[in-house]
Amino acid sequence: MSRLRIFADTNPATPEFDSRDGDAIASELKKIGVTFERWHASAPVEPGATPEQVMDAYRADIDRISAERGFKTVDVVSIAPDNPKREEMRAKFLDEHFHKEDEVRFFVAGSGLFTLHVDAKVYEIECVKDDLIAVPDSTLHWFDMGPEPHFVAIRFFTEPDGWVGHFTGTEIAKQFPRYAPEKPHKAS
């Protein structure tokens, strides 16, 4: 389930806001210029679906947001827990950075944690299946896919080189907990 927690950037122990309500999450994020939406597929997306099948299932929303924001390229990324490069991939964006274009992701499956650093606040957004997040360009943030990453996401780009991470060199990301998604409970 999606979740937003907001902290003072000097107090990673106690959230000032904590919600799993999609409308409340969207409302809070809108205050800092971040878009949060819930999408639903027009057709079932089965495990092992091709990128084209994934994009076809969300075509209306993809076309809408691409037209609204001027995206030129859309792709699908899929990361599984058994990926031999999972640690390297996770480490790539764990430190605070920004991009020179909006970072827009839609989670078709799985989850990940976007953490934004805006105006002395830290916004932890756990994105799960059916969540779209659009982080404005130059917003300081980091992303954690967890120790056993599992997600399929649609990514949107305006320029191929715009999505390069520009790292700040600060240690703030290390002050906040790493992402550890809840595992489903097994019946006893």
From Swiss-Prot:
Catalysed reactions, semicolon-separated: 1,2-dihydroxy-5-(methylsulfanyl)pent-1-en-3-one + O2 = 3-(methylsulfanyl)propanoate + CO + formate + 2 H(+); 1,2-dihydroxy-5-(methylsulfanyl)pent-1-en-3-one + O2 = 4-methylsulfanyl-2-oxobutanoate + formate + 2 H(+)
SUPFAM superfamilies found in the cross-reference section: RmlC-like cupins
One GO term of the biological process aspect: L-methionine salvage from S-adenosylmethionine
Pfam family, one: ARD
Entry binding sites for Ni(2+): H97, H99, E103, H141
Disulfide pattern: none
Keyword Metal-binding: yes
Cofactor note: Binds 1 Fe(2+) cation per monomer.
Single GO term (MF): nickel cation binding
Associated pathway: Amino-acid biosynthesis; L-methionine biosynthesis via salvage pathway; L-methionine from S-methyl-5-thio-alpha-D-ribose 1-phosphate: step 5/6
Annotated site, Important to generate the dianion, chain positions: R105
InterPro entries named in the record: ARD, ARD_bac, RmlC-like_jellyroll, RmlC_Cupin_sf
Binding site for Fe(2+): H97, H99, E103, H141
EC numbers on record: 1.13.11.54, 1.13.11.53
Cofactor(s) annotated in UniProt: Fe(2+); Ni(2+)
Record's keyword annotation contains Zinc-finger: no
Chain positions of site May play a role in transmitting local conformational changes: D102
Site (May play a role in metal incorporation in vivo): E96
Family indicated by similarity: Belongs to the acireductone dioxygenase (ARD) family.
PANTHER family, sorted: ACIREDUCTONE DIOXYGENASE (PTHR23418:SF0)
Known partners and oligomeric status: Monomer.
Descriptive protein name: Acireductone dioxygenase
Species of the source: Xanthomonas oryzae pv. oryzae (strain KACC10331 / KXO85)
